[in-house]
Amino acid sequence: MPGVTSERTASRFDAIPGPLGLASASLEGKVALVTGAGRGIGREMAMELGRRGAKVIVNYANSSESAQEVVNAIKKSGSDAVAIKANVSDVDQIVSLFDQAVKVWGKLHIVCSNSGVVSFGHVKDVTPEEFDRVFTINTRGQFFVAREAYKHLEVGGRLILMGSITGQAKGVPKHAVYSGSKGAIETFVRCMAVDFGDKKITVNAVAPGGIKTDMYHAVCREYIPGGTELDDEAVDEYASTWSPLGRVGLPIDIARCVCFLASQDGEWVNGKVLGIDGHAMM
């Protein structure tokens, strides 16, 4: 079902709130590029952009099959899409990605930077290799995606970076490297919003919390005391208590906010980090 990328049996925590593809934030005539769009949040972002009328460049690093599934789904929704392979840990590949992207439909209006990796570990155990792995993709990669976005976006375009609830006011044990890599994104946004102003491009970030992707259960257990002893349904039950709304977040929750920022409705939102966590109190 839309918004869920795993193969397991759906539960009440998978129910999507409200109908898909409402026209309130139409993106007809726009061209969007989404990095890391083959799975999880990036997948749903790409699909929702397509549902709202945008043509979508579906970037992926490894699985061409997953990326093609997203392309097919976007085409089925009535829009158009192509998949382009590039690993955002490599700046040369980022440059090539944008060069290829603008050649597809001749322009680019929206860039959504989504690629990222997660990491847990006490500070005393963090190796230079692990630090570099996380910052190379989550921080350095997003910076150079932003650099190329500035060069290639049309005047009045949109750049949306990917932060995290842990990069804001959440102190999570054994999460310093990941949280730090995401905290830097918030500073990028504030500074880039100024630099991008001469092209009338808005720069914002979304900061998701507890979103149910294919890696959700494994990662979520790290936030729950004794989480390794819980089955998937018990993880959902526990995680749902973090929000006063009594549910867990879904990729579509992030995708809808991204589409708002990408649309005309988000014109006057600039230099902001939008927390999307259901007011989670972890």
From Swiss-Prot:
GO term, biological process aspect, one: melanin biosynthetic process
Which family does the record claim for this protein? Belongs to the short-chain dehydrogenases/reductases (SDR) family.
Q: Which GO terms describe its molecular function?
A: oxidoreductase activity, acting on CH-OH group of donors
Induction profile: Expression is positively regulated by the cluster-specific transcription factor PfmaF.
- This entry's Enzyme Commission designation comes to 1.1.1.-
Q: Which InterPro entries match?
A: NAD(P)-bd_dom_sf (IPR036291), Sc_DH/Rdtase_CS (IPR020904), SDR_fam (IPR002347)
Q: Which gene encodes it?
A: Pfmaj
Protein's job: Trihydroxynaphthalene reductase involved the biosynthesis of dihydroxynaphthalene (DHN)-melanin, a bluish-green pigment forming a dark layer in the conidial wall that protects the conidia from UV radiations. The first step of the pathway is the production of the pentaketide 1,3,6,8-tetrahydroxynaphthalene (1,3,6,8-THN or T4HN) by the polyketide synthase PfmaE though condensation of acetyl-CoA with malonyl-CoA. T4HN is not stable and easily oxidizes into the stable form flaviolin. T4HN is also substrate of the hydroxynaphthalene reductase PfmaG to yield scytalone.
Task: List the pathway annotation.
Answer: Pigment biosynthesis; melanin biosynthesis
Identify the catalytic residues.
Answer: S164, Y178, K182
Q: Which residues make up the binding site for NADP(+)?
A: I41, N114, R147, Y178, K182, I211, T213
Q: Which UniProt keywords apply?
A: Melanin biosynthesis, NADP, Oxidoreductase
Quote the protein name from its UniProt record.
Answer: Trihydroxynaphthalene reductase PfmaI
Give a yes or no for keyword NADP in this entry.
Answer: yes
Q: What class of enzyme is it?
A: oxidoreductase
Stored Pfam families:
adh_short_C2
Organism whose genome encodes this protein: Pestalotiopsis fici (strain W106-1 / CGMCC3.15140)
